């Protein structure tokens, strides 16, 4: 829950909101915040549970992160489930000594408050519905006009994310976005996973070892979505972003006319990533 949206909800409905963090595998809660909490925090660990922020190499913990440094969130406690039915899923879910890998990124402060900064796993989460990017990439990569595709979450102020994909086309191809979406719709059984948008790109951003670097794609589409939103509402401002070590993706909006700042804040308050307006 973004802090601006939290404040807006409290003001509109005259009711206090406490932020929290959890997932199905933890029987709802991992942490919850008292009504007085630092902005952006999802609270402290619930009683009898443990939270650990680490760097991972596969399933091996290489380092416990110091305060303020972002890493993978591990959780252990009586609220954590016993495991998945599928052994294949279990093999990737557990780290040493019963620690469950949430797949989320976050950090803690000196007072024990937890902050979410991103996601380590590539899942697209559409209003609580988990979508495996592979469901989208498999039919796209099988198309003769596609060299490679990468599915990521399209920022959405209502559902959090919608499925989308970046695609590198074959040389000379004139395939359109609508045609590829129609191809996915006919090839995919999971309706909620059909991409809502496809962006064409000359080449995928790669890591030093040649793997597709999804954070750059997320950064790119986030800027695009916000720029389109501002254009639609006739707000003239500059949009930029950066990937911070602690907070993850941070979007910056600057140069907005003073009489439109209030409208701008209302427009972007539903997004879950950090937005700074100057």
What is the predicted role of each segment?
Residues 3-20, 24-114, 121-123, 136-137, ...:
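Conserved AMP-binding/adenylate-forming
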Residues 14, 48, 89, 145-148, ...:
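Glycine-centered tight turns that cap/initiate beta-strands
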Residues 20, 54, 117, 152, ...:
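Solvent-exposed beta-strand sheet faces enriched in polar/charged residues
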Residues 77, 82-83, 92, 97, ...:
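AMP-binding/adenylate-forming catalytic core of the ANL superfamily
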Residues 156, 202-206:
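Short, internal active-site loops enriched in acidic
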Residues 198, 204, 213-218:
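Active-site/pore-lining binding-face segments in mid-to-C-terminal subdomains
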Residues 269, 273-278:
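Generic structural signal for coil/turn-prone sequence and helix-edge features
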């Amino acid at each position: 829950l973004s802090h601006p949206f939290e404040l807006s909800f409290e003001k509109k409905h005259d009711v206090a909101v406490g932020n929290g963090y959890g997932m199905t595998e933890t029987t709802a809660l991992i942490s919850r915040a008292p009504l007085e909490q630092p902005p952006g925090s999802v609270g402290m660990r619930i009683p009898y549970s443990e939270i650990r922020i680490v760097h991972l190499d596969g399933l091996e913990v290489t380092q416990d992160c110091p305060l303020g440094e972002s890493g993978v969130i591990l959780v252990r406690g009586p609220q954590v489930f016993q495991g998945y039915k599928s052994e294949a899923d279990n093999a990737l879910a557990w780290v040493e000594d019963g620690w469950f890998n949430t797949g989320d990124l976050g950090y803690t402060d000196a007072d024990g408050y937890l902050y979410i900064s991103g996601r380590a796993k590539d899942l697209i989460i559409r209003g609580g519905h988990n979508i495996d990017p592979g469901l989208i990439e498999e039919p796209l990569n099988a198309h003769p006009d596609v060299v490679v595709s990468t599915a990521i979450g399209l920022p959405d102020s209502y559902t959090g994310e919608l499925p989308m994909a970046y695609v590198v086309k074959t040389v000379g191809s004139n395939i359109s976005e609508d045609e590829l979406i129609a191809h996915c719709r006919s090839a995919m059984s999971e309706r909620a996973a059909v991409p809502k948008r496809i962006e064409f790109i000359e080449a995928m951003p790669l890591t030093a070892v040649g793997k597709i670097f999804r954070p750059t794609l997320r950064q790119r589409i986030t800027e695009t979505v916000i720029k389109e939103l501002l254009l639609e509402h006739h707000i003239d401002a500059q949009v930029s972003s950066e990937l911070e070590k602690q907070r993850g993706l941070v979007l910056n909006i600057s140069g907005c006319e003073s009489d439109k700042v209030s409208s701008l804040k209302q427009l972007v308050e539903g997004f879950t990533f950090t937005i700074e307006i100057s």
